[in-house]
């Protein structure tokens, strides 16, 4: 009985230390999931009001005017700060039939915007001409979607403008988003996504992303994790966190990053974008990971149960090993000389 209690005490102490370390680490790292990040979110009411102002549609007197976060950052009567450019990427100029409607909806809604479709050849030439130090890493990516990811960061940093995935159609004009120095959209569970985003040229957030591409260019065992952590949404979400921690208090206007809520992104009458079938790069491992995310509570409970069972079995076997037993026995049976004999020695 004592032996079982001893084993369990060691097991509990080690796991308490590990769990405490993990909780403290994630509490410091994941501001993207914390309530204190709500100050970065663009309120839906603010966007609706901006669209009304830009469309010369005066809100009803009965409708309360929102308190604009933008008022303290930028005067909307002035010029927008993000250039009127739409960037998209594909392998060639021949866009798949299923995405032509989405592509055309963005072009038709923005006749006064410059439209650039970055093909694989154009992307590589752009990197070679403007950022030759990165070309070896660009060519070495094992998945083409990684190159599609990084080119959007480089062109937004270089030219500014708005990036839109080809599987995102446009429902609203983007004019009201051009008054924010950087806008990204919120997503679950990774913080922010990279399928739609906008930026002024040479913004420090995109500079930080580019600076970390070389360090993140490694394999993470599964294709889905490799893409997400090297160039995808997880990588820019972690860097979003890092960037926010480096900002002065209060930050300057051009340092700000604004976050678009899910309802303003898609699936509502006021949303900027419409949904088309996409995620063509997802493999079987992505399906497993996404299934786990949809059943996260069950996965966490099952994972903890499995972890505790296996870790207890490991500790039990370790404590029964002859090396540990020899150490414990030697400590317990170490003879103690009488005081008189100790003085003689």
From Swiss-Prot:
InterPro entries: Glycosyltransferase_domain, GlycoTrfase_DXD_sugar-bd_CS, Nucleotide-diphossugar_trans. One of its GO terms (molecular function) is mannosyltransferase activity. Keywords: Glycoprotein, Glycosyltransferase, Golgi apparatus, Membrane, Transferase, Transmembrane, Transmembrane helix. It is a multi-pass membrane protein. GO terms for biological process: mannosyl-inositol phosphorylceramide biosynthetic process. The keyword NADP does not apply. One of its GO terms (cellular component) is mannosyltransferase complex. Glycans are attached at residues 55, 269. It is found in: Golgi apparatus, cis-Golgi network membrane; Golgi apparatus, trans-Golgi network membrane. It is an enzyme of class 2 (transferase). The chain crosses the membrane at residues 4-24, 220-240, 296-316. Its EC number is 2.4.-.-. With imt1 and imt3, is required for the synthesis of mannosyl phosphorylinositol ceramide (MIPC). Catalyzes the addition of mannosyl to phosphorylinositol ceramide (IPC). MIPC is essential for cell morphology, cell-surface distribution of ergosterol, localization for plasma-membrane transporters, and lipid-raft-mediated endocytosis of plasma membrane proteins to the vacuole. Belongs to the glycosyltransferase 32 family. This is Inositol phosphoceramide mannosyltransferase 2. It comes from Schizosaccharomyces pombe (strain 972 / ATCC 24843) (Fission yeast).
């Amino acid at each position: 009985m004592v032996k079982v209690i001893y084993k369990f005490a060691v097991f509990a102490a080690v796991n308490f230390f590990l769990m405490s370390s993990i909780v403290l680490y994630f509490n410091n790292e994941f501001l993207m999931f914390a309530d204190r990040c709500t100050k970065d979110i663009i309120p839906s009411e603010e966007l609706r009001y901006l669209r009304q102002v830009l469309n010369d549609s005066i809100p009803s007197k009965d409708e309360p005017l929102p308190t604009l976060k933008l008022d303290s950052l930028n005067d909307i009567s002035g010029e927008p700060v993000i250039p009127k450019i739409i960037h998209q990427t594909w392998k060639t100029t021949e866009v798949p039939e299923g995405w032509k409607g989405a592509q055309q909806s963005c072009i038709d809604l923005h006749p006064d915007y410059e439209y650039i479709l970055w093909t694989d050849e154009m992307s590589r030439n752009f990197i070679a001409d403007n950022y030759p130090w990165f070309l070896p890493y660009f060519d070495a990516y094992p998945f083409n979607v990684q190159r599609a990811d990084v080119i959007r960061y480089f062109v937004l940093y270089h030219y500014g403008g708005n990036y839109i995935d080809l599987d995102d159609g446009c429902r609203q004009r983007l004019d009201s988003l051009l008054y924010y120095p950087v806008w990204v959209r919120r997503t679950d569970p990774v913080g922010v996504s990279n399928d739609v985003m906008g930026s002024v040229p040479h913004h420090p957030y995109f500079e930080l992303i580019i600076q970390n591409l070389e360090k993140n260019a490694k394999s993470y065992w599964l294709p889905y994790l490799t893409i997400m952590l090297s160039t995808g949404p997880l990588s820019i979400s972690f860097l979003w966190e890092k960037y926010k921690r480096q900002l002065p208090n209060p930050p300057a206007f051009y340092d700000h990053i604004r976050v678009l809520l899910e309802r303003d992104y898609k699936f509502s009458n006021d949303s900027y974008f419409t949904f088309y079938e996409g995620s063509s790069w997802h493999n079987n491992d992505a399906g497993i990971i996404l299934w786990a995310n949809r059943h996260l509570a069950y996965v966490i409970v099952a994972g903890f149960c499995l972890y505790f069972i296996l870790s207890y079995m490991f500790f039990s076997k370790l404590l029964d090993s002859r090396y540990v037993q020899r150490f414990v026995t030697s400590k317990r049976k170490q003879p103690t000389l009488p005081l008189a004999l100790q003085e003689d020695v």
